[in-house]
Amino acid sequence: MRIAILFLIFTTNILAEEIIGIPKIVDGDTVQINEYKIRLEGIDAPEMKQQCKKPYLQIMFFTFQKDYFCGQVSKKKLIQKIGNKPVKCILLGKDRYKRYLAKCFKGTINLNRWMVRNGYAIAYRKYSKLYVPDENLAKEEKLGLWRGTFVEPEQWRRKNK
């Protein structure tokens, strides 16, 4: 009997809960499905009011850049990628703001990875190194944020509290 109870306790903690539904996109790294506010684990997207720079004109060796709201672009790209389709989020825990941390999928596409690989978010190295190779590829190919210059979202939040 004790073994059965211990087995139930340990397996309950090991099994990850899945949430499936059509999400409301809050920003580039947060979605909401029903009452579940979900942070895409291991990534950090620019904040909604954050401005980044992107090239718009190159003359000889000079590249002129202009400001744009990169957090809004990040959110828009996630909306476009998901469309009006259901996603499956595998809940991995909670963050200090009580949001669920999750890996989310549209079909077989890992949305966390897709955001980083396409340059709309960065790997959140403070919490996970999982998406660093994807970030390196996006940087190498100058995709998304990597086309121009930007302050890492965590640094931007600290400066703009």
Label the predicted regions.
Residues R2, N13-K161:
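Small beta-barrel nucleic-acid-binding modules, primarily SNase/OB-fold domains
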Residues A4-I9:
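Sec-dependent signal peptide hydrophobic core
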